Amino acid sequence: MRRPYPALAAHGALSRGTFAVAVLVSLAVLFAPADDVPSAPPGVDKAVHLLLFATLALSGRWAGVRAGVLAALLIGYAAVSEVVQGLSPLGRSASVADWVADALGVVVGLAVWARLVVRSPG
């Protein structure tokens, strides 16, 4: 039977609040107008996407959301965010590469969470 570290076991207000803050940050990052997005060297935006969605996956698991449900929701959210960026007057563009980075971030976040869960003796 798998048991998380004690600090990860409680799905209380702190874990749910952390997930809520991560979602709000993602909304601000993903839907900021193009003028508000700082310029960066090539590839940095993909790293930001990966880290953002890894954070969403980790905090979502800590909040108690089941892995399969969370993965489906986050990958769907990533796809919708790219479509909205492409269709909206934000001056942003849709990118399959961004979506792939988002999906990879979900996988990384879930893998890190799974690694934090340890097998209990017995």
Labelled PLM ranges:
Residues 1-99, 103, 107-122:
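Bulky hydrophobic segments
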